Amino acid sequence: MAGSVNKVILVGNLGADPEIRSLGSGDRVANLRIATSETWRDRSSGERKEKTEWHRVVIFNDNLVKVAEQYLRKGSTVYIEGALQTRKWTDNTGQEKYSTEIVLQKFRGELTMLGGRGGDAGMSSGGGDEYGGGYSGGGSSFGGGQRSQPSGPRESFSADLDDEIPF
């Protein structure tokens, strides 16, 4: 294989308000704790089971840090795209520690707020135009999903098209 891919996609809920810190360089970083859950019914007992995984997310992109600081709260539902990285450090007792995190670098990664418990409703951190991307109007679609027409006096795009095929 010529290359490799390191991409993580999560849709989950924040377990706490974002933690915002400043680095020595003056750059700001947001740390998020995101829970993803899966549920199933036990075949033998019929009992409903649930398993929750907790993920550490670190955001280095200043614009996304601002979005996290202003709009995200405990319980907010988010869509995250980032890269998996493992950090290694030595604690106060001299023991080596490891932490695996989903990292959103300055120019890579995505954070989209989805409607849900936190009261947020489909705001996207990415750019976008009035025909799609950006705000998705309720968080039901992300990543280009369904397009909506802009509101206002503009005519719809299809009004300019002729119904007849020219050949």
UniProtKB/Swiss-Prot annotation:
Keywords assigned by UniProt, alphabetized: DNA damage, DNA recombination, DNA repair, DNA replication, DNA-binding
Recorded GO CC terms: nucleoid
Stretches with biased composition (Gly residues): 118-146
CDD domains linked to this entry: SSB_OBF
MF-aspect GO terms: single-stranded DNA binding
Region (Disordered): 118-167
Database matches in PROSITE patterns: SSB
Positions of the SSB domain: 5-111
Keyword Oxidoreductase tagged: no
Alphabetized SUPFAM superfamilies for the sequence: Nucleic acid-binding proteins
Motif (Important for interaction with partner proteins): 162-167
Cited HAMAP family: SSB
Subunit composition and interactions: Homotetramer.
Function: Plays an important role in DNA replication, recombination and repair. Binds to ssDNA and to an array of partner proteins to recruit them to their sites of action during DNA metabolism.
Name of the protein in its database record: Single-stranded DNA-binding protein
Organism, scientific name: Caulobacter vibrioides (strain ATCC 19089 / CIP 103742 / CB 15)
